[in-house]
């Protein structure tokens, strides 16, 4: 499905999981509230839709990129405790609260929102020591012996293996406990987003004429070449700022965002023509206004 369909699917899951019957019990029992696993190429807007959903549904959002974390930050730090077992005092290992779970409680306290989304990006690219912790989260909704609070939807995201050599495949036991959604880039959906978010018209008109340049990822030898939706959006922002500041826009700048040589070259040529036409149009409008 495309990113808009994925957003709508997650919104429905959120509302279904949080809904209660007339007695106050969840319509979907807690143990059957499966985490959602988004699998899709990088830069198509997975993180962006989570922010939109949280804002539109009025819930909290705690987001983490899991490749930046260790087993200790996810599970908490071990500490030695003393407890009585069968009349004897023994030392046991317990864990401090997970940094991630603590962040959920911080979010609830700071925003006053008791319901929310825990979004964990790059979940299938974590280190070998952290991988079992992530599997436990998806299977049991907990880190170590600490459960994710009720009324918090777990959404995890990752890239398919063809986009990232670090990807770890999930086993059937894990996939059987999640709602897996495969997301693909779709230009028409992105153009609707672009219109609402005032993406530079040079970008949108170019992509309308060159739809095959919207998204691509390839590997040649040790070189990665790619163009993503994120790249186009960020390029749009820098084009606007350069125009205001009267800075020149060249192929080198464009290539920093569109990291595929042919696309960068062709858009650079298109933008030069666009810039000249736009300048002439503005000059003509100014002349008419003065008359």
Model-derived regions, located:
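Cytosolic catalytic cores of cyclic-nucleotide second-messenger enzymes
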Residues: 290
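Single, functionally critical "micro-switch" positions that shape active/binding sites
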Residues: 158, 227, 283
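Alpha-helix boundary/capping residues
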Residues: 13, 17, 78-81, 197-198, ...
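Charge-dense polyanion-binding interfaces
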Residues: 247-278
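AAA+ P-loop NTPase catalytic core and its hallmark functional loops
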Residues: 2-205
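Non-catalytic, well-ordered alpha-helical scaffold segments
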Residues: 132, 229-233, 261, 265
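Conserved AAA+ ATPase small/helical "lid" subdomain
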Residues: 198-254
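Conserved small/polar residues in nucleotide/adenosyl-binding loops
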Residues: 279-286
């Amino acid at each position: 499905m495309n990113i808009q369909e994925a957003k709508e699917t997650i919104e429905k899951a959120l509302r279904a999981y949080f809904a209660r019957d007339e007695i106050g019990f969840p319509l979907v029992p807690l143990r059957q509230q499966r985490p959602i696993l988004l699998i899709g190429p990088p830069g198509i807007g997975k993180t962006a839709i989570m922010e939109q959903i949280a804002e539109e549904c009025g819930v909290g959002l705690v987001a983490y990129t899991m490749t930046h974390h260790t087993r200790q930050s996810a599970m908490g730090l071990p500490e030695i405790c003393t407890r009585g077992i069968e009349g004897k005092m023994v030392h046991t290992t317990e864990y401090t609260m997970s940094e991630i779970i603590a962040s959920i409680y911080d979010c609830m306290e700071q925003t006053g929102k008791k319901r929310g989304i825990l979004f964990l990006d790059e979940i299938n690219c974590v280190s070998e020591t952290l991988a079992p912790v992530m599997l436990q989260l998806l299977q049991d909704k907990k880190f170590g012996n600490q459960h994710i609070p009720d009324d918090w939807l777990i959404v995890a995201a990752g890239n398919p293996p063809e986009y990232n050599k670090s990807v770890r495949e999930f086993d059937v036991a894990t996939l059987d406990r999640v709602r897996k959604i495969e997301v693909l880039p779709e230009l028409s959906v992105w153009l609707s987003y672009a219109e609402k978010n005032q993406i530079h018209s040079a970008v949108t008109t170019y992509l309308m004429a060159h739809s095959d340049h919207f998204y691509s990822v390839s590997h040649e030898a040790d070189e990665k070449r790619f163009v993503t939706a994120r790249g186009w959006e960020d390029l749009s922002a820098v084009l606007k700022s350069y125009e205001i500041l009267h800075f020149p826009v060249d192929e080198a700048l464009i290539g920093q965002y569109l990291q595929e040589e042919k696309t960068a070259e062709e858009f650079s040529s298109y933008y030069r023509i666009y810039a000249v036409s736009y300048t002439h149009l503005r000059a003509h409008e100014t002349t008419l206004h003065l008359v």
